[in-house]
Every structure is written in C-alpha cells, then in structure tokens.
C-alpha cells in the first residue's frame, strides 16, 4: 500500500495571516533537503553535531543508513524532477481513497482539503 506520509503541517490561520513565512520556510527546507540528498554524510555529521547526546546517532553508520533509506522513499515516481515536498495530485487522491476505504477517513474530501504545492519554490 503506497501512501503519502511526510510533509509540513500548517495551520490554516498561518496560511491566511503569514503566507510569506511559509514560503520562506519551505524554500529553506527544500534547499537543505536537496543539499542533503547530494551530501548525505555531511548532513548526518551536522545532525550528530547538533545532537551529540543522541544514543541513536552515536551508533556508527546507523544515521547514514537511515537517511539513505528514508531519502529513497521521499521522491514518489510522479514527483520526479520536482522540488522535495512536491506531491502529485494523483498520489494525494490515491492516499485519500485508501484512508477512506481502510482507515474510515470521513469525510473523504479532496486534495485541496489536505494538501497544496502552492507554497513550494519553483
């Protein structure tokens, strides 16, 4: 079962009151994500530096393995060539349909009720 699961959750009031803040945050986040995709060891080293007391990060190679696995899942086939975080309307609808059928999502809704690509750069 393929479902979308990662994303940035934003309160509707923030969208209404400060959309430029969301744009700036997502611009920085997508730049960081794109850089980390090309430089995974450097990204992991920065994470270890930020959280030196993390028992998980202290395990040699574990953080890099997890990053590589997670990174591979972050780009849905329909989002190929897009900025990190961009989602295809079809993928969102597929996820909504699965959740409505198997997880009793109600009301079912449509993409615009849950997701937008409008604040992403590019």
Task: Indicate residue ranges for each PLM-predicted region.
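Conserved C-terminal helix/tail region of periplasmic/extracytoplasmic solute-binding proteins
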Residues: 90-122
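A bilobed periplasmic-binding-protein/Venus flytrap-type ligand-binding module shared by bacterial periplasmic
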Residues: 4-20
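Residues that recognize and position ribonucleotide moieties
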Residues: 1, 8, 85
